[in-house]
């Protein structure tokens, strides 16, 4: 009966394209958060006293767990064993947790000279958050591909995958275009309020 119900859900064009919009928006947010720090490098150097080594350490963190701990392979195994709902929710939770840790690290003032693994504590915690976020967003990408394959068949599948990726990359564009003006605006608002 569930197979028959699933078949009927897949037949609904409105539902099919709504699912695509939902997963594409999720990936748009993921790509936005992946690239949001790039335009802020000068601000990080000026306000948080990061240098190029700190920034390079931070940005390299995105691939740490995916490459060295083979998390993408484990993510694929989990996706095959547990399904798209479990894996998708888990990936989103990893993204939120990693992003929260990165935000905490960047907005918290740590004691001067506090070091962790030879780097400033702030940089290390931000990098750890970014590494966790990276696992979540990459596993979400695998999950989105499987969702598209489940919902779309034939000639629509390639179009759906292309639309999802194009929508996700809009997140990168938004990060490059909006980040500095928003940061400058919020900094100006903080100055006016205090």
Predicted regions and their residues:
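C-terminal ends and interior cores of transmembrane alpha-helices
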Residues: 93-118
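Cytoplasmic helix-loop-helix junction between adjacent transmembrane helices
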Residues: 123, 129-166
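Helix-loop-helix hairpin linking two adjacent transmembrane segments in secondary transporters
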Residues: 164-194
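Small-residue-rich segments within alpha-helical transmembrane domains of MFS-like 12-TM solute carriers
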Residues: 31, 35, 118, 122, ...
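Extracytoplasmic
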Residues: 18-52
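Small-residue-rich transmembrane alpha-helices and their cytosolic helix-loop interfaces
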Residues: 27, 59, 63, 92, ...
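Central cavity-lining transmembrane alpha-helices of secondary-active solute carriers
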Residues: 60-77
